[in-house]
Regions:
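Short acidic/polar hinge/loop motifs at secondary-structure boundaries
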Residues: 119-145
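N-terminal periplasmic accessory domains that precede
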Residues: 77-80, 99-104, 117, 141, ...
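Structural signature of Gram-negative outer-membrane beta-barrels, strongest in the C-terminal barrel
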Residues: 234-239, 249, 343-346, 350-352, ...
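Conserved C-terminal beta-signal and adjacent last beta-strands/turns
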Residues: 332, 336-348, 352-356, 396, ...
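Short, acidic, small-residue-rich periplasmic hinge/interaction motif at the N-terminus
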Residues: 28-70
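Membrane-embedded beta-barrel scaffold of Gram-negative outer-membrane proteins
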Residues: 291-318, 458-475, 490-548, 557, ...
Length: 699
């Protein structure tokens, strides 16, 4: 075992042994047992069918609450991988690359196939997904198409992040942390009420890390991280029927990135990072939103207005070698304004309905410059891509008889986008005059209707439910921001039919909750990403694909103050028909970037020492997540076999102070988190074992 890791192991072990000398007899706290009955089982579970927009969905919906997030030290949304079954959000490259895959449905670049919302504000670009997880009340993951319930259609599902409300929690918190690789963290939050019906919150933080991957050429870490954020919110209950929420977030990241080393297919070994130019990514992300709601006796209304601004800059040594061959600069500015209206029934009648309308205007200005150092020339390419979208959706639920209900929904989508493309060239050494190489002006229009049908049975006596649903998914096409051939300028829409059979049951007097689902996805014209050396990512449409599998989630509280969660997902996703070219036929191959298995096991136990101890509470948490097998490209020539990561945390509370110690990938499992083929095979090694400690002050 490396010396550094051995010291850190001994440090945590000695801390735990020292702790036991201060413990009295562990006496369960009856007040806390109530919390476990009402909250513990819902940490990673499926939302029940209640009269809310979210719970009208007749498919798998998993919720991760703030307790689970804090006990497992989840600092990024990517750490929900495998915690939610068949959910995969790989962490590689930089924050610019944050793809999401649910049941094999996803997109590596150019617009996610999974919708992402933070307090009702949509995030449409992958580069805006990786945000800080502090002060999060819950993360809800909807698996399967959600077009009849959410604004912009998401062919794979929805991630809905909700922050803490100052009307439900008041207090001030400071957190100071330090860990391996010089990881430093500072966070603060303040929640307060101005009277009985108005509240405000202010939160912020800073995170620094030296990095995990050393560049052998520069002898410096390639993936240093500096991140700062701030959030403000105002919540106002105008009266018993009207509600107003105004919130804004600003996030700035400056990081080294793309720590890729050469990968040897024969030995399965990945070499250290070794390229001559520093690669980096900087992102400024700003989001603001206004939500107005009305809840009457028979109807409810919601209006969500949102604005998002992204400005980022990428620099990448795209030959990934010590040779000074070529370097790529990528600068992007995006603005997005969206409006969503929802009107739905709000009573207990046999017929429930929901109507929604969504409009969006997005403007992207992007400049990608490829510098060919050895040839002493550069090719800057300028893109202007405005996108306008409009959608109207409806869902009806009819209660039939004896607990049976029939659900039908319909969605209409319209989207148009235009491309203004200008490619130039100039001499690098002189930074001379630009010469036009290519000029393209083009436009695209998409129009689509997608239905949904479902039958559900609700056993109200035991609070169990069962369902079967058939849903059509759709994702519009668009323009490639890099291309070599005329036919690569744009790509078409993709479609799927999602068939699902599932059930959700409470057992053993509500001490065990179980959820299971079987699904089959028939996928047409899948949007597939191809990495072109020196050019970037190009999207094209495959012919016919399928994804089938099942999911199982168990949550139990067998003893007071003990909660156990288990989730497993299996996905078998392959190309049924994919003739890429005259010579390349990938029909029958597995889809890339899709784990065959996802596994998560976790347990948390709270102890309450006797009144003679100065310690109020101790929480012990351990979790294991597993993934694999994952193919990295359509040719299925390189893959990552199944691997598992073990994490643990202990927190000790005394009065207003809480001390935490945690470790991630404790067994120092070696695995690749991403791989691709360029001039050679390259891969990024996953994070090694690392540890940390933090002090929280709450008052």
């Amino acid at each position: 075992m490396p010396i550094l890791y051995e010291i850190e192991y001994n440090y945590m072990l000695n801390s735990i042994l020292l702790l036991t000398s201060f413990l009295g007899t562990a006496v369960p706290n009856d007040a806390d047992s109530t919390v476990f009955k009402t909250v513990g089982l819902s940490e990673v579970t499926v939302v029940e069918f209640k009269k809310s927009k979210e719970n009208l969905a007749t498919n798998s919906v998993s919720v991760v609450d703030s307790g689970f997030i804090n006990r497992h030290e989840l600092q990024s949304i990517t750490e929900l991988t495998a915690v939610v079954p068949n959910f995969y959000m790989p962490e590689y490259g930089s924050k610019q690359n944050t793809p999401v895959y649910i049941r094999g449905v996803g997109a590596k670049t150019k617009g996610s196939a999974v919708g992402f919302y933070v307090d009702g504000i949509p995030h449409f670009e992958n580069s805006s997904f990786d945000v800080d997880m502090s002060n999060i009340a819950s993360v809800t993951v909807f698996r399967g198409p959600q077009g009849t319930l959410y604004g912009r259609n998401a062919i794979g599902g929805i991630i809905n992040v909700t922050t803490v409300s100052p009307l439900t929690y008041q207090g001030t918190q400071f957190k100071l942390g330090y860990g391996s690789h010089n990881d430093a963290l500072f966070q603060f939050s303040h929640y307060n009420k101005l009277g009985s019906k108005m509240g405000y919150s202010v939160a912020g933080g800073y995170h620094y890390n030296d990095g995990f991957h050393r560049n052998m050429f520069t002898n410096k870490y390639a993936d240093q991280l500096k991140d700062a954020y701030g959030r403000v919110a105002l919540v106002w209950l105008l009266d018993n029927k009207w509600f107003l929420r105004v919130n804004s977030m600003l996030d700035y990241s400056n990081q080294g990135g793309y720590p890729y080393g050469k990968y040897n297919r024969l030995t399965g070994e990945t070499e250290p990072v070794n390229y001559n130019r520093y690669s980096s990514y900087r992102r400024l992300l700003s989001t603001s939103g206004v939500n107005i709601r009305y809840a009457g006796e028979n109807i409810s209304f919601s209006s969500q207005t949102a604005f998002q601004y992204i400005r980022d800059r990428q620099g990448i040594d795209q030959d990934f070698t010590s040779n000074d061959t070529y370097f790529v600069k990528n600068r992007l500015k995006q603005t997005m304004l969206s409006q969503e209206f929802i009107l739905k029934s709000n009573n207990s009648s046999r017929y429930q309905w929901l109507w929604g309308a969504f409009a969006m205007s997005q403007h992207i200005n992007n400049t990608v410059e490829t510098q060919y150092i050895t040839k002493d020339n550069a090719f800057p390419t300028h893109y202007r891509i405005p996108v306008n979208a409009l959608a109207i959706y409806h869902q009806s639920t009819i209660k039939l008889f004896s607990g049976f209900s029939f659900i039908a929904g319909l969605r209409w989508d319209y989207e148009n986008s235009t491309l203004k493309y200008l490619r130039e060239t100039y001499q690098l050494s002189t930074d001379g005059a630009r010469t036009e190489v290519k000029n393209v002006n083009s436009s695209l229009h998409f129009n689509q209707i997608t239905p949904k049908f479902a039958l559900q049975y609700q056993d109200e006596c035991n609070n169990n439910s069962y369902y079967f649903s058939v849903t059509r998914g759709y994702k519009a096409g668009g323009f490639n921001q890099t291309f070599q051939k005329e036919e690569e300028t744009s790509f078409g829409p993709e479609y799927n039919w999602n068939y699902e059979l599932g059930g959700k049951v409470h057992l053993l007097k509500d001490k065990l909750y179980a959820e299971a689902a079987l699904y089959y996805i028939d996928w047409r014209q899948q949007q597939v990403n191809q990495t072109v050396p020196g050019v970037g990512n190009v999207i094209h449409n495959a012919g016919h694909s399928s994804s089938k599998g099942f999911e199982l989630a168990l949550n139990s509280s067998p003893l007071k103050n003990l909660s156990i969660a288990l989730s497993y997902g299996y996905t078998y996703a392959k190309f049924i028909e994919y003739q890429k070219s005259a010579k390349l036929n990938y029909s029958g191959n597995m889809l890339p970037m899709v784990p065959r298995n996802t596994l998560s096991c976790s347990a948390s136990y709270a102890l309450y020492p006797s009144s003679t101890s100065f310690i109020d509470k101790i929480v012990l948490t351990a979790g294991l997540t597993g993934l694999g097998k994952i193919y990295w490209a359509e040719d299925n020539e390189v893959a990552q076999n199944f691997y598992a990561l073990l994490n643990a945390k202990i927190s000790i509370t005394s009065g207003i102070f809480t001390w935490e110690c945690w470790g991630k990938n404790i067994t120092d499992t070696h695995y690749n988190t991403y791989s691709f083929k360029s001039s050679a095979d390259y891969a990024q090694i996953g994070k090694p074992a690392y540890f940390g400690t933090s002090l929280l002050v709450k008052f």
